[in-house]
Amino acid sequence: MKVFDYEDVQLIPNKCIVNSRSECDTTVILGKHAFKMPIVPANMQTIINRSIAEFLAENGYFYIMHRFNGSARIPFVKKMKERQWISSISVGVKKEEYLLIEELAKQGLTPDYITIDIAHGHSNSVIEMIQRIKTHLPETFVIAGNVGTPEAVRELENAGADATKVGIGPGKVCITKIKTGFGTGGWQLAALRWCAKAARKPIIADGGIRTHGDIAKSIRFGATMVMIGSLFAGHEESSGETKIENGIAYKEYFGSASEFQKGEKKNVEGKKIWIQHKGSLKDTLIEMHQDLQSSISYAGGRDLEAIRKVDYVIVKNSIFNGDTI
């Protein structure tokens, strides 16, 4: 198996067939819904919040609400249903999450999407949660993760998952690779390719995205959707503390397995960093959209499918994608 990561790969252009990049269509379908772009902000507390979720849903973007305010999830689904926007939430695998699924079913609330969100998704607990959701909420599109092997993808698909999320520890505020020695950090793009070849259902690439060009690379190597954390951190709308240093504003960004999320220093596999304030989230989404349209034009097509067919070269080798503790 070839081992490489995002900065090791360059995609090779094809003849352009559009008169303007603006003709290129970045639409993607996941489940029963179409979305403006194949991107989703990470379901982390400093990346997604209720107001951002509402903005994304209203404007045709995919989102996954984080699971760190458990009691707010049923009212959240109810509100999104009332507004006729897509409802997309996260769950863990603890027993109280089973009660949430049962209560949603009891109230006749079927979320459009539920993401089972744990660090090591190739586990019996995730398989049991998939089956529990499919029993009580059979119409819900279930995303399961996170995983890093073809065996895991196949097993979760066979258990009933409608999509799998690939990536163990490649994120900017994740230190799983350093703390445990395991994961896809440093070879996330190769892991995505490996898993996508085995998949029969959509793959969501999660982690290691440092540039907008990495979105196109993820599509090329098999992702239907790309989950992004650090590029969506630090915006005006983002949750988290703001600080000013030497006249420059910064916002905090921390991992879901960090002590800042957990509230205690136990089984820590995440860290906190400060991101320079980026302004409006809307402006970042516009820039991402334009850059992805450019990627499609370089691929020689009119839609995302063109990117999947381009050739590529491996230009160098890397290990940790620039990350340290």
UniProtKB/Swiss-Prot annotation:
GO terms for molecular function: GMP reductase activity. CDD domains: IMPDH (cd00381). NADP(+) binds at residues 203-226. Coiled coil: none annotated. Keywords: NADP, Oxidoreductase. It is an enzyme of class 1 (oxidoreductase). The keyword NADP applies. GO terms for biological process: purine nucleotide metabolic process. It comes from the Bacteria. Its EC number is 1.7.1.7. The keyword Zinc-finger does not apply. This is GMP reductase.
